[in-house]
Curated annotation (Swiss-Prot):
It comes from Arabidopsis thaliana. This is Mannan endo-1,4-beta-mannosidase 1. Belongs to the glycosyl hydrolase 5 (cellulase A) family. It is an enzyme of class 3 (hydrolase). Substrate binds at W87, N197, Y277, W361. The keyword Secreted applies. One of its GO terms (cellular component) is extracellular region.
Length: 411
């Protein structure tokens, strides 16, 4: 989404077929055991939020930017949320982190330092995305422009552009936090890295292009940071590797050059992700609640099945939301949508399945400004509120009784 302007870790990796099984020893870092996330030797499930705005907001020390970040994290923690997904990029123009290739704003980096530090204080783990597919916050188009090129898809193939991206990855992962004194790659507050928010490619050979890019960049991230988990940033669209699965795509189409199955089978990718936006994906059914409900159930169910049986890695729903800008919106409809997603997550978790949690789009602390994309959620106290639904989900996941942790086989 977004189309708007000290602990030490030891992993025992086993390669079985295409799948890496990670068994985490006692540590502050989250690891993976088969289709489950583990933390300090115990299974962990996630309930959280997106807040792409945190880094740039925290960089604005002249106003109350950092207080806004603190308020959001405090409110999230109060309802039991334990993970946040944020941007670790902003190229080019408004409050840029990366002003030009290799040139960074120290003030904006200090904003990210603060977010990482403050999230740790509230026991909230961070998923940090490293670049945007879209033009907002720069994205791959800005990288291509820096190389003097015109076609955004060259982001995935041009050697100079790929080096720009690798340089950014290294700069972020090896950043020494000015507050904690710890490099990001050594900080257990970070849950995982995300290669790119919602990758897409229109080239006629797009599926091969994206597969090759993910392999290369995932290997590069792991060469720098073996502590943290890694995911791609996929929305979950099926590709041509298993043609019969494309019926689950919105409209049954093959979309965007991504392939949920083959992309997530890359060994250096630790878990799979999906997004869910029935209002925008199914505009003709935007006012037909029953049809949207059917799509949501089928969409999540198909991906859980594939992560359980084919990919054999955890599944995290990293974006879902319902916008007030679509016809027929009401708080009641949004709450029913959230509850539907939460119920599927909980049912999978309770059964020991691969769906490990959900991260809604998006948490904000006020009703004004550029953050108002229609999806914003405010932590209003009281019964029958979205905040109460979130709190209930956090409690249900936290109170699950798990069997003793065993090492899973990928067979």
């Amino acid at each position: 989404m977004l189309n708007i302007l000290p602990f030490f870790l030891f992993f025992l990796p086993f390669l079985i077929g295409n799948n890496r099984i990670c068994v985490a020893v006692k540590t502050g870092f989250v690891g993976r055991n088969g289709t489950q996330f583990v933390l300090n030797g115990e299974q962990v499930y996630l309930n959280g939020f997106n807040a792409y705005w945190m880094m740039t907001t925290a960089a604005d020390t002249a106003s109350k930017g950092r207080a806004t970040v603190t308020t959001a994290l405090r409110q999230a923690s109060a309802v039991g949320m334990n993970v946040a997904r944020i941007w670790g990029f902003n190229e080019g123009d408004y409050i840029p982190l990366q002003i030009s290739p290799g040139s960074y704003s120290e003030d904006v980096f200090k904003g990210l330092d603060f977010v990482v530090y403050e999230a740790g204080r509230f026991n909230i783990k961070l998923i940090i995305s490293l670049v945007n597919n879209f033009e907002d916050y720069g994205g791959r188009k800005k990288y291509v422009e820096w190389a003097g090129l015109d076609e955004p898809d060259e982001f995935y193939t041009n050697s100079a552009v790929k080096q720009f991206y690798k340089n950014h990855v290294k700069t972020v992962l090896t950043r020494k936090n000015t507050i904690t004194g710890r490099m990001y790659k050594d900080d257990p507050t970070i849950f995982s890295w995300e290669l790119i928010n919602e990758p897409r490619c229109n080239d006629s050979t797009a599926s091969n292009i994206l597969q090759d890019w993910v392999k290369e960049m995932a290997s590069y991230v792991k060469s720098i940071d073996s502590n943290h988990l890694l995911e791609i940033g996929l929305e979950g669209f099926y590709g041509e590797s298993i043609p019969e699965r494309t019926v689950y795509n919105p409209g049954g189409r093959v979309l965007t050059g991504t392939d949920f199955i083959t992309n997530n089978q890359i060994p250096d990718i630790d878990f799979a992700t999906i997004h869910i936006y029935p209002d925008s994906w199914l505009p003709l059914q935007s006012s037909r609640t029953g049809e949207q409900d059917t799509f949501v159930d089928r969409w999540i169910g198909a991906h859980i099945e594939d992560c359980d049986n084919i990919i054999k890695k955890p599944l995290l729903i990293t974006e879902f939301g319902k916008s007030s800008k679509y016809p027929g919106f009401s708080l009641e409809k949004r709450n029913k949508f959230f509850q539907r997603v939460y119920d599927v997550i909980y049912d999978s978790a309770r059964a020991g399945g691969s769906c490990t949690g959900g991260v809604f789009w998006q948490l904000t602390t006020n009703r004004t400004g550029l953050l108002g994309d229609g999806y914003e959620v405010f932590m209003q106290a009281g019964p029958n509120t979205t905040a109460q639904l979130i709190a209930d989900q956090s409690s249900k996941l936290k109170n699950l009784k798990y069997p003793p942790l065993v090492t899973h086989s990928a067979e």
